[in-house]
Amino acid sequence: LFSEDETPNWPPFHQFDQIIQTRACEGEAFYDGILSPNLTQDERNVVVQSYAGLLCSKQFYHYVVEDWLQGDPAIGKPPPERTQGRNKNWQHLYSRDIISMPDKWEYPWFAAWDLAFHMVPMAKVDPGFAKNQLSVFLREWYMHPNGQLPAYEFHLDDVNPPVHAWAARRVYEIEKESDKPDRNFLTSVFQKLLLNFTWWVNRKDDEGNNIFSGGFLGLDNISLFDRSSDVPMGGRLQQADGTAWMGFYCSNMMQMALELARDGDRHAIAYEDMASKFFEHFVQIVDAINTHGGTGLWDEIDGFYYDQVLLDHEVLPIKSRSLVGLLPLIAVTVIDEDQLDKLPGFRKRFEWFLKHRKDLARYIIHSRTGKKRWLISAVPFQRLQRILIRLLDP
Protein backbone atom coordinates (compact mmCIF):
# COMPACT_ATOMS: atom_id res chain seq x y z
CA LEU A 1 0.00 0.00 0.00
CA PHE A 2 1.28 3.46 -0.83
CA SER A 3 0.08 6.98 -1.47
CA GLU A 4 -0.51 7.93 -5.11
CA ASP A 5 2.02 10.75 -4.79
CA GLU A 6 4.62 8.35 -3.40
CA THR A 7 4.73 5.78 -6.17
CA PRO A 8 7.62 3.42 -5.39
CA ASN A 9 10.51 3.05 -7.75
CA TRP A 10 10.27 0.25 -10.25
CA PRO A 11 11.40 -2.47 -10.37
CA PRO A 12 10.70 -3.16 -6.68
CA PHE A 13 13.49 -4.22 -4.33
CA HIS A 14 16.20 -3.03 -6.73
CA GLN A 15 18.03 -1.52 -3.72
CA PHE A 16 17.32 -4.46 -1.44
CA ASP A 17 20.89 -5.78 -1.14
CA GLN A 18 22.31 -2.31 -0.59
CA ILE A 19 19.79 -1.48 2.15
CA ILE A 20 20.33 -4.78 3.95
CA GLN A 21 24.10 -4.30 3.80
CA THR A 22 23.77 -0.78 5.20
CA ARG A 23 21.58 -1.97 8.07
CA ALA A 24 24.04 -4.82 8.79
CA CYS A 25 26.93 -2.36 9.00
CA GLU A 26 24.91 -0.12 11.31
CA GLY A 27 24.14 -3.12 13.51
CA GLU A 28 27.82 -4.09 13.70
CA ALA A 29 28.75 -0.53 14.64
CA PHE A 30 26.04 -0.47 17.33
CA TYR A 31 27.26 -3.68 18.96
CA ASP A 32 30.89 -2.53 18.73
CA GLY A 33 29.96 0.08 21.32
CA ILE A 34 28.31 -2.46 23.63
CA LEU A 35 30.15 -5.77 23.44
CA SER A 36 33.58 -6.59 24.80
CA PRO A 37 36.31 -6.54 22.13
CA ASN A 38 37.72 -9.68 23.73
CA LEU A 39 34.85 -11.87 22.49
CA THR A 40 35.60 -14.40 19.78
CA GLN A 41 33.52 -14.16 16.62
CA ASP A 42 31.46 -17.18 17.72
CA GLU A 43 30.84 -15.65 21.13
CA ARG A 44 29.90 -12.34 19.54
CA ASN A 45 27.43 -14.07 17.22
CA VAL A 46 25.75 -15.80 20.16
CA VAL A 47 25.39 -12.53 22.08
CA VAL A 48 24.08 -10.59 19.07
CA GLN A 49 21.56 -13.34 18.28
CA SER A 50 20.45 -13.35 21.92
CA TYR A 51 19.88 -9.61 21.88
CA ALA A 52 17.99 -9.99 18.59
CA GLY A 53 15.65 -12.49 20.25
CA LEU A 54 15.16 -10.14 23.18
CA LEU A 55 14.43 -7.13 20.97
CA CYS A 56 12.06 -9.12 18.76
CA SER A 57 9.92 -10.10 21.75
CA LYS A 58 8.30 -6.67 21.97
CA GLN A 59 4.58 -6.82 21.25
CA PHE A 60 1.53 -4.59 21.44
CA TYR A 61 -0.62 -6.06 24.20
CA HIS A 62 -4.22 -4.99 24.75
CA TYR A 63 -6.19 -6.50 27.62
CA VAL A 64 -8.86 -4.59 29.55
CA VAL A 65 -10.15 -6.84 32.32
CA GLU A 66 -13.40 -4.95 32.87
CA ASP A 67 -14.27 -5.21 29.17
CA TRP A 68 -13.44 -8.91 29.12
CA LEU A 69 -15.65 -9.60 32.15
CA GLN A 70 -18.59 -7.68 30.67
CA GLY A 71 -18.19 -9.19 27.22
CA ASP A 72 -18.58 -7.75 23.72
CA PRO A 73 -22.02 -6.07 23.39
CA ALA A 74 -22.00 -6.83 19.65
CA ILE A 75 -21.90 -10.56 20.37
CA GLY A 76 -24.00 -10.88 23.49
CA LYS A 77 -23.58 -11.17 27.21
CA PRO A 78 -21.05 -13.70 28.49
CA PRO A 79 -22.17 -16.37 30.96
CA PRO A 80 -22.84 -14.81 34.39
CA GLU A 81 -20.20 -16.99 36.06
CA ARG A 82 -17.48 -15.11 34.16
CA THR A 83 -17.88 -12.13 36.48
CA GLN A 84 -16.95 -14.39 39.38
CA GLY A 85 -14.16 -16.19 37.54
CA ARG A 86 -10.48 -15.54 37.06
CA ASN A 87 -9.13 -11.99 37.23
CA LYS A 88 -12.36 -10.64 38.72
CA ASN A 89 -10.30 -8.73 41.29
CA TRP A 90 -8.29 -6.90 38.62
CA GLN A 91 -10.92 -4.71 37.01
CA HIS A 92 -8.58 -1.71 37.25
CA LEU A 93 -6.08 -3.39 34.88
CA TYR A 94 -6.00 -1.61 31.53
CA SER A 95 -3.18 -2.88 29.38
CA ARG A 96 -2.62 -1.05 26.12
CA ASP A 97 1.15 -0.98 25.82
CA ILE A 98 4.17 -2.31 23.98
CA ILE A 99 5.41 -5.02 26.35
CA SER A 100 8.32 -7.44 26.28
CA MET A 101 6.84 -10.94 26.10
CA PRO A 102 8.53 -14.12 27.38
CA ASP A 103 8.37 -15.11 23.70
CA LYS A 104 5.85 -13.42 21.45
CA TRP A 105 5.44 -16.55 19.31
CA GLU A 106 5.13 -19.24 21.97
CA TYR A 107 4.13 -17.14 25.02
CA PRO A 108 2.37 -13.99 23.66
CA TRP A 109 1.37 -12.61 27.05
CA PHE A 110 3.29 -10.70 29.69
CA ALA A 111 4.80 -12.43 32.69
CA ALA A 112 5.87 -9.81 35.20
CA TRP A 113 8.77 -11.68 36.74
CA ASP A 114 10.12 -12.95 33.40
CA LEU A 115 10.01 -9.36 32.20
CA ALA A 116 12.03 -8.19 35.20
CA PHE A 117 14.84 -10.62 34.36
CA HIS A 118 14.74 -9.72 30.66
CA MET A 119 15.10 -6.00 31.33
CA VAL A 120 18.55 -6.42 32.89
CA PRO A 121 20.22 -7.38 29.57
CA MET A 122 17.81 -5.05 27.76
CA ALA A 123 19.39 -2.15 29.67
CA LYS A 124 22.59 -2.70 27.70
CA VAL A 125 20.92 -2.10 24.33
CA ASP A 126 17.85 0.01 25.15
CA PRO A 127 17.94 1.38 28.72
CA GLY A 128 14.99 3.68 28.07
CA PHE A 129 12.74 0.77 27.15
CA ALA A 130 14.03 -1.27 30.11
CA LYS A 131 13.13 1.50 32.54
CA ASN A 132 9.75 2.00 30.89
CA GLN A 133 8.86 -1.68 31.25
CA LEU A 134 9.82 -1.88 34.92
CA SER A 135 8.00 1.38 35.66
CA VAL A 136 4.78 0.61 33.81
CA PHE A 137 4.02 -2.49 35.90
CA LEU A 138 4.20 -0.31 39.00
CA ARG A 139 1.67 2.15 37.61
CA GLU A 140 -1.93 2.28 38.78
CA TRP A 141 -3.33 0.62 35.65
CA TYR A 142 -1.28 -2.52 36.37
CA MET A 143 -0.37 -2.72 40.07
CA HIS A 144 -3.31 -3.69 42.26
CA PRO A 145 -4.45 -1.01 44.75
CA ASN A 146 -3.28 -3.35 47.51
CA GLY A 147 0.26 -3.40 46.08
CA GLN A 148 0.31 -6.77 44.30
CA LEU A 149 1.86 -6.97 40.85
CA PRO A 150 -0.12 -8.80 38.14
CA ALA A 151 1.35 -12.16 37.21
CA TYR A 152 0.01 -13.12 33.75
CA GLU A 153 -3.30 -12.98 31.93
CA PHE A 154 -4.52 -16.47 32.77
CA HIS A 155 -4.15 -15.85 36.51
CA LEU A 156 -3.29 -12.29 37.48
CA ASP A 157 -3.59 -13.27 41.15
CA ASP A 158 -0.71 -15.74 40.98
CA VAL A 159 2.32 -14.94 43.12
CA ASN A 160 5.74 -14.82 41.49
CA PRO A 161 9.10 -14.11 43.13
CA PRO A 162 9.62 -10.45 44.07
CA VAL A 163 12.46 -9.67 41.66
CA HIS A 164 11.27 -6.24 40.49
CA ALA A 165 13.46 -4.35 42.97
CA TRP A 166 16.55 -6.31 41.96
CA ALA A 167 15.89 -5.69 38.26
CA ALA A 168 15.29 -1.96 38.76
CA ARG A 169 18.45 -1.65 40.82
CA ARG A 170 20.52 -3.51 38.20
CA VAL A 171 19.13 -1.40 35.34
CA TYR A 172 20.01 1.74 37.31
CA GLU A 173 23.53 0.44 37.99
CA ILE A 174 24.09 -0.48 34.33
CA GLU A 175 23.22 3.06 33.27
CA LYS A 176 25.33 4.46 36.08
CA GLU A 177 28.36 2.63 34.64
CA SER A 178 27.95 4.89 31.60
CA ASP A 179 27.82 7.98 33.85
CA LYS A 180 24.10 8.33 33.20
CA PRO A 181 22.45 7.44 36.53
CA ASP A 182 18.71 8.05 36.36
CA ARG A 183 17.87 8.90 39.96
CA ASN A 184 14.34 9.94 39.03
CA PHE A 185 13.73 6.40 37.81
CA LEU A 186 15.22 4.86 40.95
CA THR A 187 13.20 7.18 43.20
CA SER A 188 9.95 6.47 41.38
CA VAL A 189 10.25 2.68 41.44
CA PHE A 190 11.42 2.68 45.06
CA GLN A 191 8.29 4.53 46.17
CA LYS A 192 5.98 2.12 44.35
CA LEU A 193 7.90 -0.94 45.51
CA LEU A 194 7.21 0.08 49.10
CA LEU A 195 3.55 -0.73 48.37
CA ASN A 196 4.45 -4.10 46.89
CA PHE A 197 6.76 -4.96 49.79
CA THR A 198 4.03 -4.11 52.28
CA TRP A 199 1.60 -6.35 50.38
CA TRP A 200 4.05 -9.23 50.71
CA VAL A 201 4.54 -8.70 54.43
CA ASN A 202 0.82 -8.37 55.15
CA ARG A 203 -0.42 -11.18 52.91
CA LYS A 204 2.37 -13.76 52.86
CA ASP A 205 3.68 -13.66 56.43
CA ASP A 206 0.57 -15.05 58.11
CA GLU A 207 1.82 -15.01 61.68
CA GLY A 208 4.21 -12.06 61.52
CA ASN A 209 7.23 -14.25 62.28
CA ASN A 210 9.21 -13.46 59.09
CA ILE A 211 8.62 -16.95 57.66
CA PHE A 212 6.87 -16.52 54.32
CA SER A 213 4.61 -18.51 52.08
CA GLY A 214 3.79 -17.29 48.61
CA GLY A 215 2.51 -20.21 46.60
CA PHE A 216 3.72 -21.02 43.11
CA LEU A 217 6.68 -18.62 43.13
CA GLY A 218 7.64 -19.34 39.56
CA LEU A 219 9.33 -22.72 39.99
CA ASP A 220 7.52 -24.84 37.41
CA ASN A 221 7.29 -28.57 38.08
CA ILE A 222 9.54 -28.43 41.12
CA SER A 223 7.10 -29.01 43.95
CA LEU A 224 5.43 -32.20 45.11
CA PHE A 225 2.06 -30.45 44.84
CA ASP A 226 0.58 -27.25 43.43
CA ARG A 227 1.74 -24.62 45.88
CA SER A 228 -0.78 -22.11 44.51
CA SER A 229 -3.55 -24.21 46.04
CA ASP A 230 -4.21 -25.37 49.57
CA VAL A 231 -1.91 -28.00 51.04
CA PRO A 232 -3.48 -31.38 50.11
CA MET A 233 -3.25 -32.80 53.62
CA GLY A 234 -4.34 -29.54 55.22
CA GLY A 235 -2.23 -27.24 57.32
CA ARG A 236 -0.18 -24.22 56.37
CA LEU A 237 2.85 -24.11 54.12
CA GLN A 238 6.04 -22.30 55.12
CA GLN A 239 8.35 -21.86 52.16
CA ALA A 240 12.14 -21.80 52.14
CA ASP A 241 12.20 -20.07 48.78
CA GLY A 242 9.47 -17.58 49.71
CA THR A 243 11.39 -16.59 52.83
CA ALA A 244 14.66 -16.38 50.89
CA TRP A 245 13.05 -14.22 48.20
CA MET A 246 11.86 -11.78 50.87
CA GLY A 247 15.34 -11.56 52.35
CA PHE A 248 16.59 -10.88 48.83
CA TYR A 249 13.88 -8.23 48.41
CA CYS A 250 14.93 -6.53 51.65
CA SER A 251 18.59 -6.46 50.64
CA ASN A 252 17.81 -4.78 47.32
CA MET A 253 15.46 -2.23 48.88
CA MET A 254 18.15 -1.43 51.44
CA GLN A 255 20.77 -0.87 48.74
CA MET A 256 18.37 1.29 46.71
CA ALA A 257 17.64 3.42 49.77
CA LEU A 258 21.36 3.79 50.51
CA GLU A 259 21.96 4.95 46.94
CA LEU A 260 19.13 7.49 47.11
CA ALA A 261 20.35 8.77 50.47
CA ARG A 262 23.78 9.64 49.01
CA ASP A 263 22.41 12.74 47.29
CA GLY A 264 22.62 14.72 50.48
CA ASP A 265 19.49 16.70 49.65
CA ARG A 266 16.63 17.41 52.04
CA HIS A 267 15.15 13.97 51.42
CA ALA A 268 18.36 12.07 52.24
CA ILE A 269 17.51 11.50 55.89
CA ALA A 270 14.24 9.83 54.93
CA TYR A 271 16.08 7.37 52.71
CA GLU A 272 18.63 6.70 55.46
CA ASP A 273 15.73 5.78 57.73
CA MET A 274 14.30 3.46 55.06
CA ALA A 275 17.70 1.84 54.59
CA SER A 276 17.82 1.15 58.33
CA LYS A 277 14.33 -0.33 58.21
CA PHE A 278 15.21 -2.76 55.40
CA PHE A 279 18.57 -3.63 56.96
CA GLU A 280 16.94 -4.66 60.23
CA HIS A 281 14.06 -6.45 58.50
CA PHE A 282 16.57 -8.41 56.42
CA VAL A 283 18.47 -9.54 59.51
CA GLN A 284 15.20 -10.57 61.17
CA ILE A 285 14.28 -12.72 58.15
CA VAL A 286 17.75 -14.27 58.23
CA ASP A 287 17.23 -15.10 61.90
CA ALA A 288 13.78 -16.58 61.26
CA ILE A 289 14.84 -18.91 58.44
CA ASN A 290 17.61 -20.26 60.67
CA THR A 291 16.12 -20.34 64.18
CA HIS A 292 12.32 -20.02 64.21
CA GLY A 293 10.90 -22.93 66.18
CA GLY A 294 14.41 -24.25 66.81
CA THR A 295 16.30 -24.45 63.53
CA GLY A 296 13.91 -22.51 61.29
CA LEU A 297 13.55 -24.13 57.87
CA TRP A 298 16.95 -25.79 58.21
CA ASP A 299 17.23 -29.55 58.63
CA GLU A 300 20.29 -30.26 60.74
CA ILE A 301 20.43 -33.95 59.86
CA ASP A 302 20.21 -33.49 56.08
CA GLY A 303 22.09 -30.19 55.93
CA PHE A 304 19.47 -28.50 53.74
CA TYR A 305 16.61 -26.00 53.82
CA TYR A 306 13.14 -27.47 53.29
CA ASP A 307 9.59 -26.19 52.97
CA GLN A 308 7.50 -27.09 56.00
CA VAL A 309 3.84 -27.84 56.60
CA LEU A 310 2.37 -26.81 59.94
CA LEU A 311 -0.40 -29.28 60.76
CA ASP A 312 -2.06 -29.60 64.17
CA HIS A 313 0.91 -27.90 65.88
CA GLU A 314 3.29 -30.37 64.23
CA VAL A 315 6.06 -29.33 61.83
CA LEU A 316 6.36 -31.61 58.81
CA PRO A 317 9.37 -30.88 56.56
CA ILE A 318 8.88 -31.60 52.85
CA LYS A 319 12.15 -33.40 52.24
CA SER A 320 12.63 -32.76 48.56
CA ARG A 321 16.11 -31.53 47.65
CA SER A 322 15.47 -28.98 44.93
CA LEU A 323 16.15 -25.35 44.08
CA VAL A 324 13.69 -24.45 46.84
CA GLY A 325 16.36 -25.32 49.40
CA LEU A 326 19.15 -23.58 47.51
CA LEU A 327 17.44 -20.21 47.13
CA PRO A 328 18.51 -18.99 50.61
CA LEU A 329 21.94 -18.61 48.97
CA ILE A 330 20.71 -15.53 47.06
CA ALA A 331 19.73 -13.62 50.22
CA VAL A 332 23.07 -11.90 50.80
CA THR A 333 24.36 -8.33 50.73
CA VAL A 334 27.43 -6.29 51.63
CA ILE A 335 27.69 -2.94 53.40
CA ASP A 336 31.01 -1.16 53.04
CA GLU A 337 32.77 1.62 54.91
CA ASP A 338 32.22 4.13 52.09
CA GLN A 339 28.47 3.84 52.47
CA LEU A 340 28.67 4.40 56.22
CA ASP A 341 31.04 7.36 55.88
CA LYS A 342 28.59 9.23 53.66
CA LEU A 343 25.49 8.41 55.68
CA PRO A 344 25.90 9.36 59.36
CA GLY A 345 22.28 8.61 60.22
CA PHE A 346 22.48 5.09 58.85
CA ARG A 347 25.88 4.55 60.48
CA LYS A 348 24.52 5.56 63.88
CA ARG A 349 21.64 3.09 63.68
CA PHE A 350 23.87 0.37 62.20
CA GLU A 351 26.40 0.66 65.02
CA TRP A 352 23.61 0.73 67.61
CA PHE A 353 22.23 -2.48 66.14
CA LEU A 354 25.61 -4.22 66.28
CA LYS A 355 26.06 -3.20 69.91
CA HIS A 356 22.58 -3.80 71.32
CA ARG A 357 21.19 -6.63 69.16
CA LYS A 358 24.00 -9.13 69.52
CA ASP A 359 21.50 -11.97 69.12
CA LEU A 360 20.96 -10.82 65.53
CA ALA A 361 24.36 -9.23 64.89
CA ARG A 362 25.88 -12.73 64.78
CA TYR A 363 24.61 -12.99 61.21
CA ILE A 364 26.76 -10.00 60.21
CA ILE A 365 30.36 -10.90 59.32
CA HIS A 366 32.97 -8.14 59.55
CA SER A 367 35.95 -8.33 57.18
CA ARG A 368 39.20 -8.91 59.04
CA THR A 369 41.62 -7.36 56.54
CA GLY A 370 41.70 -4.51 54.05
CA LYS A 371 38.70 -2.33 53.42
CA LYS A 372 36.02 -2.56 56.11
CA ARG A 373 32.99 -4.49 54.92
CA TRP A 374 30.08 -6.25 56.56
CA LEU A 375 28.52 -9.32 54.97
CA ILE A 376 24.93 -10.30 55.78
CA SER A 377 23.85 -13.72 54.53
CA ALA A 378 20.82 -15.91 55.10
CA VAL A 379 23.13 -18.94 55.15
CA PRO A 380 25.71 -19.01 57.97
CA PHE A 381 29.16 -20.25 56.98
CA GLN A 382 28.86 -23.71 58.54
CA ARG A 383 25.51 -24.29 56.85
CA LEU A 384 26.88 -22.98 53.56
CA GLN A 385 29.55 -25.68 53.65
CA ARG A 386 26.91 -28.37 54.14
CA ILE A 387 24.64 -27.02 51.39
CA LEU A 388 27.55 -26.99 48.96
CA ILE A 389 28.09 -30.69 49.62
CA ARG A 390 24.54 -31.29 48.35
CA LEU A 391 24.87 -28.82 45.49
CA LEU A 392 28.22 -30.06 44.21
CA ASP A 393 27.78 -33.76 44.93
CA PRO A 394 28.48 -35.47 41.57
Predicted regions and their residues:
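Acidic, mature catalytic/reactive cores of soluble proteins
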Residues: 1-394
